Design a protein with these regions (language model features):
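Short, basic/aromatic recognition patches
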Residues: 1-23
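Short, surface-exposed beta-strand-loop junctions and turns on beta-sheet-rich folds
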Residues: 30, 54-56, 132
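Short, structured beta-strand-loop surface elements
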Residues: 52-114, 120-122
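Short beta-strand segments
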Residues: 19-51
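General beta-strand recognition
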Residues: 45-47, 117, 124
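Short solvent-exposed loop/turn micro-motifs enriched in small/polar/acidic residues
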Residues: 17-19, 31-33, 81, 109-111
């Protein structure tokens, strides 16, 4: 059996801050796609960097997108998922660009120079706890 718990907005932000890779959901024309992306948080925005001229960079411009993160802890059989939905826009604010530039980045993505922020308007999350089923000995013996 699985117990399900809805998470409040504050806990969703806390969980977002614990991971560095998420899944970006957006449209390429009429086709929806899910793309794994590294990200960081800055001023209640999700910030991603992409390569100038890349298809994902074009699709991110002034779109409404979804961003999802999750994690699973084997030791306590707990999983969680957070989904944020909001508009994406190029980062042009010098303060934000400087802050993002100083953040640690994955070496594989250092050459990406297009910075986009997603400003979540909706954020929700769930925690799932897998409970070990208990088997009644009376039921086992009655077969």
């Amino acid at each position: 059996m699985t117990d399900l718990e809805e998470l409040d907005e504050s806990e969703c932000w806390d969980l977002l801050a614990q991971v560095t890779v998420g899944r970006l959901g957006l449209h390429f024309g009429a086709i929806p796609r899910i793309i794994p992306m590294d990200f960081t948080l800055f001023d209640k925005c999700i910030v991603v960097c992409t390569a100038v001229g890349a298809a994902v960079t074009h699709a991110l411009r002034d779109s409404v997108v979804a961003f999802q993160v999750d994690d699973f802890h084997l030791n306590n059989q707990e999983a969680w998922s957070v989904v944020a939905v909001g508009p994406s826009a190029p980062v042009t604010d010098l303060r934000t660009l400087q802050a993002v530039d100083g953040l640690p980045t994955d070496p594989a993505t250092r050459d990406r120079h297009w910075v986009t922020q997603i400003e979540p308007r909706l954020i929700s999350g769930r925690r799932f706890v897998q409970r070990t089923p208990t088997v009644s000995m009376a039921r086992v013996g009655s077969r």
